[in-house]
């Protein structure tokens, strides 16, 4: 959980800055604010394009040399890229070189995170006791809300003491304060490396090595023998990603925008920090339900709830009637649902694949879903709300949730599977 918390902290630090900082410091200042925001989101989405590549690279080594060593590499890749973002010059200083360097670092972040999640999930699932695999696997999932809490909490502290006005680039926060969360990641990475070096390799992988079942080319093998689970896992995961980046990144940009809800940035960060506790609470609940009621039935019910949630966007977020109270309710409900759908995924996706390609297969499904769900969600939602209104964003979530529901209904129940036999 420590490693995934650090990885997600690094990722969310960028996501927050993509809304409040980068449109003004890394893209031409004469742009329309919406254009600058869309450009920032485009760079934001670049990491998601890198994530499947990261899952292929790190998945190869994870299935060949082991889960432990590969996770050290993924953490270093993410940590170094995040630290370097904190040192980048701005557009005003070096022109077009600034967004180019930002995009490169964001790409490297994506590579690191692409190899992180599946390795952490496998460490949990391949060491869990019988009947408690989803419960064990939910611990790495807690890294997502804890990383988000740390990233946004630090931004909140900085904004409180240094000040921030949306669009203002002269204040202390926009001049140098925004760099602090990126630079501090180096300390967290050192802690994460200490933890990772003390880990033991999973018994399931050791057994695969002893029996000579390692794949020589995991990427080739997974597409040859497990292409159906690849497709299924991708669509099972896609609504989870879409929901999360709608109720975090997109809603932050919409909430603080003058042509949106015009809530002060500091106030909106507070609302997000309160709501994240619903995410933390619902992940263990989902893990318990997935072990007792089954993965499939749990995910079907949560998907139906997510579809219903899509119909509430207009009620909670319409500019004419929305208040901070209604936004807090929206965020809290959205985060609670997010935990319910995200919690079982670290058990479900690895259970779809055999041991010799499990790192590669689960990683590809998880990270291709990040392109189809997370990478485009803020961009699509921003375009939809500007043309059709906030209700269209809810319809977008509904459509994606239906696609995931179909995939979940097609999958087999996996809670009784033996990880050494599949």
Give the positions of each predicted feature.
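Helix-to-loop junctions at the C-terminal end of transmembrane segments
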Residues: 55-67, 283-295
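C-terminal ends and interior cores of transmembrane alpha-helices
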Residues: 28, 76-95, 304-321
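Glycine-rich segments within core transmembrane alpha-helices of 12-TM secondary carriers
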Residues: 135-160, 366-377
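Cytoplasmic membrane-interface "Motif A"-like loop-to-helix N-cap segments
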Residues: 64-76, 292-304
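Multi-pass alpha-helical transporter architecture, strongest
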Residues: 192-199, 400-422
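Extracytoplasmic gate region of multi-pass secondary transporters
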Residues: 15-16, 227-279, 373-377
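C-terminal transmembrane helical hairpin of 12-TM major facilitator-type secondary transporters
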Residues: 296-344
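Extracellular/periplasmic helix-loop-helix junction of adjacent transmembrane segments
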Residues: 18-51
